[in-house]
Each structure stands twice: as C-alpha cells, then as structure tokens.
Regions:
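ATP-dependent carboxylate-amine ligase
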Residues: 1-21, 42-45, 55-58, 86, ...
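Short, basic phosphate-binding NTP loop
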Residues: 2-117, 126-137, 159, 330, ...
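Phosphate-binding loop of NTP-binding sites
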Residues: 11-15, 97-232, 236-244, 305, ...
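Short gly/ser/thr-rich secondary-structure transition/capping motifs
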Residues: 24-33, 98-101, 149-152, 172-177, ...
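Short acidic/polar active-site loop segments enriched in Thr and Asp
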Residues: 69-70, 114, 166, 190, ...
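Short, polar loop motifs at secondary-structure junctions
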Residues: 73-79, 232-236, 253, 404-408
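Extended acidic/charged loop-beta regions that coordinate divalent cations
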Residues: 161, 174-202, 238-284, 325-328, ...
Length: 479
C-alpha cells in the first residue's frame, strides 16, 4: 500500500486533503499523524481540529515543542512565516475536520481491503466486538477502539490501518442528520450493518422517521456492489431496503430471515446457546451473555462472517470467546451474594426495556433499580421517562432511585405503576443514589444501574463495588 507513515511524502498528503503546501519540502515523508499534542511523536504532522469547546490552533506551539515536523491548519489562521526553518511543513485547508475525513478516505482506498461498518440505535458496539472476535479467528482484524465512532474517531481509526490488517470493523455513531452519510463516505464500506432502529437522538432527529432517514444514510452512500445486513424483525427494515441498490441479507428470529436463530436455550443464569441457520447449514453456538437482544447481535456478526466466507468454526469460537465492553450489562458478584448489573454505558427507551425484561428473569431475593436520565429525547422526554418509570414498577422492584433532570417523571411513572412512596427516591447526585441503594439492599438482592453516558453512573458502580467488595471469583463478564 502507498499509505504508510514514514513513507508518505507531504505533497501526497496535501493532495489527498485538497490542501495547499505553503511551507516545507515536498518529498519529506510524514512519519506520523496526530490531532493531540499530548500524544504527538517526534516527526509527526499535527492537524489542528476545531470544536465547540476547543481549538487545536491554540496548541501549535505545544506541537512544535513536542517535535512536530509540520502542521495542517485552516486558511488564514496562522502565517507560515511564523514557523522558522524551510523544512517545517505547513499545509492549509478550508476545514481541518473535513481534511481529516478526506485523508482517511484516501488512506482507506489505498489500504483497499474489506471494511465493515456497523450502526444502529442499540447494540452496535456489542455487534462490532462480536464481529471482530469472529473475524479475528481467521484474519488480522482492526476494530474501532472504545467509542471512536464519530467524525473524528472513525477517521483516526482508519489512519491506523496498516498493510498487516486484512479486515476492519468500524462502528458509526451519530446524533444528527448527515453524520452517518459523511462517515460512510469516509469509510467506503464493503458491508454495512444496521442492528436496529428505535426512538433515540430525538432531540436532533425529531421522530422515528428522522431516525430511519439518518440511519439509511449508510445505505444511500454505499455503492451497488456492496452488501447490507439488516434486522429482518425490525419494522423499519422494509423502508431501508427500498433505499439500497446492493444485496441485502436479513437476520433475526423470524423464519423469513436469511440468518436466523433456532433452538434457543438458557445454559446458565447469564449464558445461552442456540443454532444459527444460514442456507442449509445449522451451526450450534454459545454466548456468555443473556437476552434476546444479544442473540440478535450475534446473528448480525455471523451474517458478516458468512458474507466473507469465514468458517463456521471461527463463528463458534469467536462468539464463545467474546467478552463484552465495560458498562454493557456486566454482572458483578459482590460479597453478600449481591449481584450488581452494570449497564451504565448508555440508555434509551428501547435498550432499557430490553435490559429490564432480562433482569426480570434473574434469580434474586429482591431487585433494586437505579436509573439516570435518558438524554437527547427532545420533546418526548417527559413522556418517555414516565413510561420508563411504569416499566420499572412492572419489573417487581422493591426499591427504585432516579437521578437527572427527568428523574421526577421516572418516579411519577413508577408511582403510577404501583410503587409506594417508600419504595422510590429522587437523588440529586451520585452520592445520594449510592446511599439510598446501600440503605435498602439486602443479601441475595440484585442491583441494576443504567443511564445515558452523560449521567456517569459508573461512579455509583464504583462506590457500590468499593463498599461491598467484589466476591471471590470477581467480575462475572456475563458468563
């Protein structure tokens, strides 16, 4: 591949992003690339990004002091002559954010191997991890690290691809229209996966139709020779199919799906087995996670594998070896036979419903639920939080504590659902939430915590773990 740090001439870098090389030697190779002066290596090119709360142009001095060999800046922000030495590279562009995406697109094309893009309202991170676990059994696979799924994180992930990678599995997130479309242009995927569509990010998208349209940007930007993997059990799929020119493979539990699950069995309190059916093949698999939603995630990953002619053995082993990410329905066994279910990474109405449905099946003496606000729900926020409170009451909870701007609606919904006043509490901070849970939990109980990322309920998780202590055997990563 031509795209290789240490060999890429700065003139080619400038050409890839439509920039003007106003200073520096054209043939000088760019040794590396960074948008963060704290992580910049000697000889790297520093790209000065701008955001709502930061401006990389304010850190050009730090970049130089860290050993940067050049900078990419927006037009008219700096004067090239301020940089001493003719060997120092200065490239100017209209937008450094667009330049980052354009460079990643060029890099992806030069890399030229199979790339899978995954989006959806729920389950995209778990599906990404499952898919990468499967593919890595057969080939060296790059996957999105953490939550690098936006207009900055996805390009940076692509720019870390090397000739040693045979495949890439990238996650795409969004909270407003146009983001998925741009991410798809940059990633140029061979396979696109939409896990499901639900009423999330309503603040930026308006309603479910807006969500469907935003997620469909993935399909609209993919070319006719590509493959779309869609949730055949999702009501939105029919609309999505009409927006795509390529081949479609559906997954789900319904008989009409190309990839489906049969003979589902619970093999432990937090594990299950099932058969994956594809064409005439039946493949028995096991996953160390509970819930139908995780079967759907596994089916999506298996569908990707089938499209890439990955062996059934790799599917079986990849799913068996899969370990979920922190804060995504992790079961932690505490002293006193207390189960703490950490689902604090994020929350929306549909993911909360699926999680509570699964919690209801747990063996437990009593159930305590702590919920943080579900953000970005727009004008529907009050109603959806009230409904979530009713859902909590229906779960047979013995104590419920809520936190956040719409915490009162959660409590009101729980009261409407039948919870007495002594069974509910509206906390004003993380410490209060922890104190209420600590005062009401008994031996053998299960504690379930969930909230939007911005609520940072992992602080409550830490406080509970520190207070009660993790039992011998430690963290049960859903097994």
């Amino acid at each position: 591949m031509c795209a290789e740090w240490g060999k890429l001439p700065v003139r080619e870098l400038a050409s890839a992003i439509g920039g003007s090389l106003v200073s520096g030697l054209e043939d000088m190779p760019a040794r590396g690339f960074s948008t963060d002066t704290r992580k910049l290596g000697v000889g790297d090119i520093f790209l000065a990004l701008r955001g709502e709360n930061f401006d990389g142009h304010n850190f050009l001095g730090e970049a130089i002091n860290a050993g940067a060999a050049g900078v990419i800046v927006e037009n008219d922000t700096v004067k090239p002559e301020k940089f001493s030495g003719k060997n120092f590279t200065v490239i100017t562009v209209p937008s450094t954010l667009k330049a980052l995406g354009d460079l990643a697109l060029w890099w992806r094309r030069e890399w030229g191997k199979k790339l899978i893009a995954i989006t959806g309202s729920n389950g995209k991170s778990t599906t990404k991890e499952m898919t990468a676990s499967i593919l890595s059994k057969q080939a060296h696979t790059m996957k999105t690290p953490g939550n690098f799924n936006n207009l900055i994180g996805l390009p940076l992930t692509i720019l870390s691809l090397t000739s040693g990678h045979s495949m890439a599995v990238l996650e795409m997130g969004m909270n407003r229209a146009g983001e998925i479309g741009r991410l798809t242009q940059i990633a140029n995927p061979d396979i696109g996966v939409i896990t499901n569509i639900a009423g999330v990010h309503l603040e930026g998208l308006g309603d479910l139709s807006g969500v469907i349209k935003a997620k469909a940007e993935l399909l609209e930007e993919m070319h006719s020779g590509t493959i779309a993997i869609l949730n055949g059990d999702d009501n939105a799929t029919e609309k999505l199919i009409s927006m795509f020119q390529g081949k479609v493979i559906n997954f789900g539990l319904g008989k009409m799906n190309s990839v489906r699950a049969e003979d589902i069995k619970r093999t432990g309190e937090h594990a299950q087995s099932f058969d994956i059916i594809f064409n005439d093949e039946r493949v028995p698999v096991s996953i160390n996670l509970p819930g139908v939603h995780n079967i759907m995630n596994a089916l999506a990953g298996a569908a990707v594998a089938y499209c890439l002619s990955v062996s059934s053995e790799s599917i079986v082993q990849g799913l068996a070896d899969f370990k979920p990410l922190k804060g995504r329905f992790q079961v932690i066994v505490l002293n006193g036979d207390i189960q703490l279910v950490d689902d604090t990474y994020n929350a929306n109405p549909s993911s909360l419903k699926a999680a509570i449905q699964e919690i209801k099946s747990f063996k437990k003496t009593g159930l305590l639920i702590g919920l943080g606000e579900m953000m970005e729900l727009g004008k529907e926020a009050s109603r959806l939080h009230f409904n979530a409170g009713e859902l909590v009451a229906d779960a047979g909870v013995k104590f419920f504590v809520a936190l956040g701007k719409h915490g009162q609606q959660l409590i009101e919904g729980a009261s409407k659902g039948g919870l007495a006043g002594a069974q509910t509490c509206l906390a004003t901070n993380h410490i209060e939430m922890f104190d209420m849970i600590k005062a009401n939990v008994k031996e053998g109980d299960t504690i379930f915590l969930k909230g939007s990322r911005g609520m940072a309920l992992e602080k409550v998780v830490k406080a509970i773990k520190d207070h009660f202590g993790v039992s011998k055997g430690g963290l049960v990563l859903n097994n």
